[in-house]
A protein has these predicted regions:
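Small-residue (Gly/Pro/Ala) motifs that create kinks and tight helix-helix packing interfaces
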Residues: 110-114, 118, 178, 182, ...
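Membrane-interface interhelical linkers
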Residues: 1-78, 82-93, 142-165, 169, ...
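Juxtamembrane helix-start motifs in multi-pass secondary transporters
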Residues: 35-36, 99, 197, 257
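Hydrophobic transmembrane alpha-helices of multi-pass small-molecule transport proteins
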Residues: 47, 112-115, 124-145
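Membrane-interface helix-loop-helix junctions at boundaries between adjacent transmembrane segments
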Residues: 87-128
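Residue-level recognition of pore/gate-forming positions within transmembrane alpha-helices
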Residues: 40-44, 104-108, 130-133, 137, ...
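Conserved extracellular-gate-facing transmembrane-helix segments in secondary transporters
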Residues: 170-174
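Short alpha-helical packing/oligomerization segments
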Residues: 251-262
Length: 262
């Protein structure tokens, strides 16, 4: 196994946390979908520049998309939009502690989805490590929020809890789907496959969320433009996080990547 995915995943997790921290500053200035839009629209130009550097600067061939790739990208893009919206929505609840804690079950869901969709099962040893790490992350998260086991079970019926579980599912699904997209290109350069997948994904996401905002939330585009400085910072941090995630997904199982990324 190529262990390059380990430092790449650590970088992805760092910049994802940075992006999320920056994105919270937009919460009071934009709607939930407006803040979601920023992540994709302002990351896309950076994704295009990076792909151009790889293709033109290093003389690498541009991947040739196929129908399977298109299907993976569409599914991955939509699930990631849903995840981002749900995560931002979750922070608007005063009692989101249980929800954010249970969203950490994402890695277990990734392992299951990867086995179903990509026919890639983790080894028994890795499965044990994933379960132990997930329990550890849940315990740490619950301790941070001062949650008891009983409190978590009592909160299972709350809307914020269900949103948290849904966050874990859609984040896990997008990870698996984007791995499927990059691998379906069958390209010699994993870096180029990851970069090409990210360009197409963020473009599609930008188009879809733009249509939503223009149709249902008129005025949000203007608000985004008014906050372009912080939006551009969010987009840059988000691009680095995304290209690191996508690259790691091409190097090894998404379950391993998400387990380390927690």
């Amino acid at each position: 196994m190529n262990f390059l995915w380990i430092p790449v995943t650590i970088a992805a997790a760092f910049f994802q946390n940075l992006r999320s921290s920056l994105q919270r500053h937009l919460k009071g200035k934009l709607s939930d979908m407006g803040a979601t839009y920023v992540r994709f629209a302002f990351a896309w130009p950076f994704a295009v520049i990076w792909l151009a550097v790889l293709v033109l600067g290093f003389n690498l061939d541009l991947p040739q998309p196929n129908l399977a790739f298109v299907g993976w990208v569409i599914a991955g893009s939509v699930t990631q939009i849903i995840f981002t919206f749900l995560l931002i929505w979750l922070f608007s609840f005063s009692n989101f502690a249980v929800g954010t804690t249970l969203s950490k079950t994402e890695v277990l869901q990734v392992a299951l989805l990867e086995a179903i969709l990509l026919k890639e099962a983790v080894t028994p040893l890795a499965a044990g490590a994933i379960i132990v790490s997930s329990i550890g992350v849940l315990a740490l998260s619950a301790g941070k929020e001062r949650l008891t086991v009983g409190g978590m079970f009592r909160g299972l019926g709350q809307k914020s809890t269900l949103i948290g579980l849904a966050c874990g599912f859609f984040l896990g699904a997008s990870s698996v789907l984007f791995r499927g997209a990059a691998l379906s290109l069958n390209h010699d350069s994993l870096l180029t496959s990851a970069a090409f997948t990210l360009v197409l994904a963020t473009l599609l996401q930008t188009i879809l969320v733009t249509i939503w905002l223009v149709t249902f939330e008129k005025g949000q585009i203007s608000s985004v433009v008014a906050n372009w400085r912080i939006a551009a910072t969010v987009g840059f941090a988000g691009w680095i996080a995304s290209i690191c995630w996508f690259t790691a997904f091409t190097l090894t199982n998404a379950a391993y990547v998400r387990a380390l990324g927690q």
